[in-house]
From Swiss-Prot:
Name by which UniProt lists this protein: DNA-directed RNA polymerase subunit alpha
Catalyzed reactions per annotation: RNA(n) + a ribonucleoside 5'-triphosphate = RNA(n+1) + diphosphate
Subunit organization: Homodimer. The RNAP catalytic core consists of 2 alpha, 1 beta, 1 beta' and 1 omega subunit. When a sigma factor is associated with the core the holoenzyme is formed, which can initiate transcription.
Stretches for region Alpha C-terminal domain (alpha-CTD): 251-340
Region: Alpha N-terminal domain (alpha-NTD), residue numbers: 1-235
Domain comment as written in the entry: The N-terminal domain is essential for RNAP assembly and basal transcription, whereas the C-terminal domain is involved in interaction with transcriptional regulators and with upstream promoter elements.
Gene name linked to the record: rpoA
Alphabetical keyword list: DNA-directed RNA polymerase, Nucleotidyltransferase, Transcription, Transferase
Classification via InterPro entries: DNA-dir_RNA_pol_insert, DNA-dir_RNA_pol_RpoA/D/Rpb3, DNA-dir_RpoA, RBP11-like, RNAP_asu_C, RNApol_insert_sf
Function: DNA-dependent RNA polymerase catalyzes the transcription of DNA into RNA using the four ribonucleoside triphosphates as substrates.
GO biological process: DNA-templated transcription
């Protein structure tokens, strides 16, 4: 039964890429190799969770001095209340605890009003202090009390209005708690050995800075894992086969391939054959200087072999303890069946 999941190929690492100056908000994450079809399966599931289920903080209610409803204007303020509320929705807030807290904006100075002018209670941080809220003229004043709550997804103003703490003068607003702003994924081909029909999952994630794209993806994966656990009706008990696999040295399976399987030029292939190099494991233990001493083996052949090895995650000059294994022929066949 264990073969249903243990023999599926899994990603080696999750690579993180993107502009270094924006990587806290925008990043591209690449997972490869994946079994054919798993790129779309995982990509779609992760995208849906990223856009719907992550917890965050947002303003759910505002109270503006002298204003009773959102279809009003504030004397001395260029923007009307609707525009001010739209700008407030764009605040990127980090709150250490759950519950309800308040933040305050009190300004009586002419000019632009930004998020950095907001006074926060302990445990609340505004991550976009340059975000525009409103613009005051000479006679303008602005006094706003904002209620910050925690939640997930998108909650409409009507639901916030039904809250027991709602009072006359409070203006409930739509609250977007999710720190993830955009997610897109695509699937490309990945190569494992000579096979090129595996999947590479590429995800472009943009957040508001409250969490990094890498952490957001990790949280989404954990949510999926936690939701799927109840469907598993057996214990993952180690078997004799599992212990055998643990005791086996963790070789790169390409080491057990024969060098004549590589798509090398005739000159390079003949040089390796004449030097009695049978397996790739034999080849990688050779240094560059040793290879160049091989008759008829030049710099061009060396570069060709280095390029082929690099595609496998290998290189010349490696040290392989206990190589070659006593049963190398059997292991070669076994690794070929399991990985190729």
């Amino acid at each position: 039964m264990y073969r249903n999941w243990t023999e599926l190929i899994k990603p080696h690492t999750i690579e993180l890429g993107g502009d270094e100056t924006e990587i806290q908000r925008k990043a591209t994450l690449v997972a490869e190799p994946l079994e054919r079809g798993f790129g779309t399966t995982l990509g779609n599931a992760l995208r849906r969770v990223l856009l719907s289920s992550l917890q965050g903080a947002a303003v759910s209610t505002v109270r503006i001095e002298g204003v009773l409803h959102e279809f009003s204007s504030v004397p001395g303020v260029i923007e009307d209340v609707t525009d001010i509320i739209l700008n407030i929705k764009g605040l990127a807030l980090r709150m250490e605890s759950t519950g309800i807290k308040n933040i305050y904006l009190r300004v009586d100075k002419e000019g632009p009003v930004t998020a950095g002018m907001i006074e926060c209670e302990t445990g609340i941080e505004i991550l976009n202090p340059d975000h525009h809220i409103a613009t005051l003229n000479k006679s303008g004043t602005l006094d706003i009390t904002m209620t910050v709550t925690t939640g997930k997804g998108y909650v409409r103003a009507q639901l916030n209005r039904e809250d027991e703490s709602y009072a006359i003068g409070d203006i409930p607003i739509d609250a977007s708690y999710n720190p993830v702003k955009k997610v897109a994924y695509r699937v490309e081909n990945a190569r494992v050995g000579q096979q090129t029909d595996y999947d590479k999952l590429i995800m472009d994630i943009e957040t508001n800075g409250v969490v990094t794209p890498e952490d957001a993806l990790a949280l989404a994966a954990k949510i999926l894992q936690d939701q799927l656990n109840p469907f598993i009706n057996f214990d993952d008990v180690p078997t004799a086969h599992d212990h055998e696999m643990e005791d086996r040295p963790q070789w790169n399976p390409n080491l057990f391939r024969k060098v004549d399987e590589l798509e090398l030029s005739v000159r390079s292939a003949n040089c390796l054959k004449n030097d009695d190099i049978v397996y790739i494991g034999d080849l990688v233990q050779k240094s560059e200087s040793e290879m160049l001493k091989t008759p008829n083996f030049g710099r061009k052949s060396l570069n060709e072999i280095k390029e082929v090895l690099d595609e496998m995650g290998l290189s010349l000059g490696m040290t392989l303890d206990t190589w070659p294994p006593e049963n190398i022929d059997d292991l070669s066949k076994q690794f070929e069946e399991e990985n190729f």
